Amino acid sequence: MKTFTPKPADLTHDWYVIDATDVVLGRLATQAATLLRGKNKPTYAPHADSGNHVIILNADKIALTGNKLGKELYMHSGRPGGLRRDSYAQLLKTNPERIIKSAIKGMLPKNRLAKVQLDRLHIVRGAEHPYAGMKPQVFEIAQVSQQAK
């Protein structure tokens, strides 16, 4: 019996929608990274692009546990003096998409395939999204008993 290797014609890219209301950031990021890589499919191969599209709704309503609101998210442009520091509390008000995207990006592999997979991530602040024509499947994240409020 030969080992199955998926060809590009065998790969499909499904659409999933996740509601991020009161979901802890790390739990949301791990589930989204798994879907983006396509690890939920039987045809998964680490070298093949078998990932899915993931739509995350209500990005401004995610839950941050512990004292993350006081911590900062760092980004550097590569130029002298290009260090940018933004606190999570400020980013949650102005740009919650950046918080979620950076958490998911850290959970993807560090290779060329990660950029392709990250391009399939669609983050929306509200409850409505423009991807209804793709007929996304609802993906539920199991909540843990204790929640950060």
UniProtKB/Swiss-Prot annotation:
One of its GO terms (cellular component) is cytosolic large ribosomal subunit. Keywords: Ribonucleoprotein, Ribosomal protein. One of its GO terms (molecular function) is structural constituent of ribosome. The keyword Glycoprotein does not apply. It comes from the Bacteria. SUPFAM superfamilies: Ribosomal protein L13 (SSF52161). GO terms for biological process: negative regulation of translation; translation. Part of the 50S ribosomal subunit. This protein is one of the early assembly proteins of the 50S ribosomal subunit, although it is not seen to bind rRNA by itself. It is important during the early stages of 50S assembly. NCBIfam families: rplM_bact (TIGR01066). Belongs to the universal ribosomal protein uL13 family. This is Large ribosomal subunit protein uL13. It comes from Bifidobacterium adolescentis (strain ATCC 15703 / DSM 20083 / NCTC 11814 / E194a). The gene is rplM.
